[in-house]
Amino acid sequence: MRPSIPLLPVFLAALVAALLPASAHADGLPVLGIDVGSTGVASNANADAARYLALPAGGRTIVERVAQRGGQILAWRSLPGTFTIPAVAYDGSAGGLSADGTTLLLIEPRVAFPRATTKMLVLNSDSLEPRRLVTLRGDFSFDAISPTGSWLYFVHYTSPTDPTRYLVQAFDVQRGRLLAKPIVDPKASGEKMRGNPLARTMSADGRWAYTLYDGAGATPFVHALDTVARSAHCIDLDGIAAGTDLWQLRLRIDQDGKRLVVRDSAAPVLTVDLRTLRVARATAVPAPLGASRHLPTSLFAGGAGLLVVLVLSVIWMRRKHRPTRTSLASVRRVREPTAGQ
């Protein structure tokens, strides 16, 4: 007989997650106070588009797949431990879902910086069944995932006091191996990246992850990570005027997919030619291609989050559907993966 979890705690957990502000922890980034578990991460916009949520429930995590249209709960599962959807930048951008919709990654929420170990859980995004539990020695956050979910990219914080010092490392999901060699721009001439990740956007095919960094007091730059080729480029944004509030800047890709647009709340500031990586001052830029893969927290908490709560309450009252309660005992584990090339 399949074990089940009482639905009243699930309902209450969802209610709290939807109505209260984000809890005082982060989902991997090196500061506290950012948690996108209740806002989730969305699949590419199509007829089967779904949003994935992770909600705390009494020492466990309820992970859900919710239809973008209509808000129906398509699948949900109860997992032991506390995990959440990873944020990849301080603008609240969410990550962890492969572009082909097959793989979802959750991360253990951060309660302090630095942390001695980092746990992440790789799930089948359809069944929400765990595929691999990854335990890494050291402080890591999630950065990106390749389109098929075969490669993960982690930010490894190398200083116990300065979260702007880090390396980007690749993780082979099939082999359970963290590659020792960091991913760097071959043209960087030994200069190490530093900075806070302020904003993120992805290419339409999910291959390229573009992250805006503040440069830690130096020149702001965009980190362009090729998640298929396991390579990267650092694009200096020298054209940003002195005194610009970098934390208000956002990234978008234009309609034809050829230019990355750096914009503030009022207008485009710079553009980057994605073929040549040349930076230019922005002129008239078409509207961004498609919608962002994350929603503002306030919008979701006030609208779609309440919709999830209502759906959960109906399920609770009818008691017809119960989530699968999963143990991680039989899940493939990776603990301190062997480094390799």
Predicted regions and their residues:
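A short beta-strand motif characteristic of beta-propeller blades
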Residues: 28-35, 72-87, 129-135, 177-191, ...
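Repeated scaffold domains used in trafficking and secretory/extracellular systems
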Residues: 33-45, 83-96, 138-147, 188-201, ...
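Short coil/turn segments that connect the beta-strands within blades of beta-propeller domains
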Residues: 48-50, 100-102, 148-150, 205-207, ...
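Residue position within the beta-strands of beta-propeller blades
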Residues: 53-54, 106, 154-155, 211, ...
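Short glycine/acidic-enriched loop and turn motifs that connect beta-strands
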Residues: 56-60, 109-114, 157-162, 214-219, ...
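Short loop/turn segments that connect beta-strands within beta-propeller blades
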Residues: 68-70, 124-128, 173-176, 226-230, ...
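Alpha-helical transmembrane segments
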Residues: 306-320
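Cytoplasmic C-terminal tails of single-pass
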Residues: 322-341
